[in-house]
Amino acid sequence: MNQKKINRIRRGKRTRLNIRESGKPSLIVNKTPRHIYAQIISGEGNKVLASISTLNKEVADAVHYTGNIESATKVGQMIAEKAKSLGIESLAFDRNGFRYHGRVKALADAARAAGLQF
């Protein structure tokens, strides 16, 4: 593994530890060059409450390409809708060691605009 990926994984582990200690549900973001994934994990960290990605048919049909900011915005809106339907208004944002820039920022901004607080 290259050093850049190792450093990202280390950052993600540190963040995840702090989030788990808070006991709040968390919105975890993961990305690849072609797709972006978002999951809401319970406060104990042992159960996935909701998940959505650009692999979902609704998202893939709504966007032209799944590896851009437009698709990340759509994923952010849809994960916020799922969270609200579960009664979750406030959660912790886990960017999984990725920089808060580009697609990660677009997903977070769309989720905030749809009513989530983190």
Curated annotation (Swiss-Prot):
GO cellular component term, pick one: cytosolic large ribosomal subunit
Keyword Ribosomal protein: yes
Organism: Dichelobacter nodosus (strain VCS1703A)
Protein name, as recorded: Large ribosomal subunit protein uL18
InterPro entries attached to this UniProt entry: Ribosomal_uL18_bac-type (IPR004389), Ribosomal_uL18_bac/euk (IPR005484)
Subunit structure: Part of the 50S ribosomal subunit; part of the 5S rRNA/L5/L18/L25 subcomplex. Contacts the 5S and 23S rRNAs.
Example of a GO MF term: structural constituent of ribosome
CDD domains noted in UniProt: Ribosomal_L18_L5e
Keywords: Ribonucleoprotein, Ribosomal protein, RNA-binding, rRNA-binding
Gene3D superfamilies registered for this protein in UniProt: 3.30.420.100
This protein's record includes keyword DNA damage: no
Task of the protein: This is one of the proteins that bind and probably mediate the attachment of the 5S RNA into the large ribosomal subunit, where it forms part of the central protuberance.
GO biological-process terms attached to the record: translation
Family classification: Belongs to the universal ribosomal protein uL18 family.
